[in-house]
A protein has these predicted regions:
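Short alpha-helical "patches" and their helix-cap loops
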Residues: 1-2, 84
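Domain-length accessory/inserted modules outside core catalytic folds
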Residues: 19, 80-81
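Alpha-helix N-cap/helix-start motif
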Residues: 12, 77-80
C-alpha cells in the first residue's frame, strides 16, 4: 500500500501517509526509542499517536492491532507525557512477546523485505 511506504527522506523519521513507520536501527541510524511503539514492536509496523496519549499501532505481517486509549490531559492530573510514552513502549513490548511466534509462522523463507 502506498500509504505505508516511507514518504520522508532517509535522514528523517520514516512516515507514510499519516503513519509513523518503524524501521530497523541500521536504517534509522538512531535509537528505536524514537519510535512511539518502542524497540520491541516489529520493524515495518505502522502507527499513529494522539495528543491525549492515545495510540494505534499495527503489524501488517501478523495482522496484530494495538489500540491504547488514554486521557493524559484530564484537568485533575498533572502533565504526564513521559509516563504515557513509557506506558506505550511497555504495552507494545509485552504484546509483541505473544505476537513473535505468530509473526514467524507468517513469514515465508523466500520473502524479501526491502526498504526505501
Amino acid at each position: 500500500l502506498e500509504m505505508l511506504k516511507n514518504q520522508n527522506p532517509l535522514a528523517l523519521t520514516p512516515r507514510g501517509l499519516g503513519w509513523e513507520i518503524k524501521k530497523p536501527l541500521s536504517i534509522l541510524n538512531k535509537t528505536s526509542l524514537a519510535c512511539s511503539c518502542g524497540p520491541n514492536y516489529p520493524d515495518d509496523s505502522c502507527g499513529h499517536t494522539g495528543f491525549t496519549g492515545t495510540s494505534l499501532w499495527f503489524d501488517p505481517i501478523s495482522k496484530q492491532i494495538v489500540i491504547a486509549l488514554s486521557n493524559r490531559v484530564n484537568l485533575s492530573r498533572e502533565n504526564n507525557l513521559e509516563a504515557i510514552k513509557r506506558f506505550r513502549i511497555k504495552l507494545h513490548g509485552l504484546l509483541n512477546l505473544n505476537n513473535s511466534s505468530r509473526r514467524m509462522k507468517t513469514l515465508k523463507p523466500t520473502s524479501v523485505v526491502t526498504h526505501e
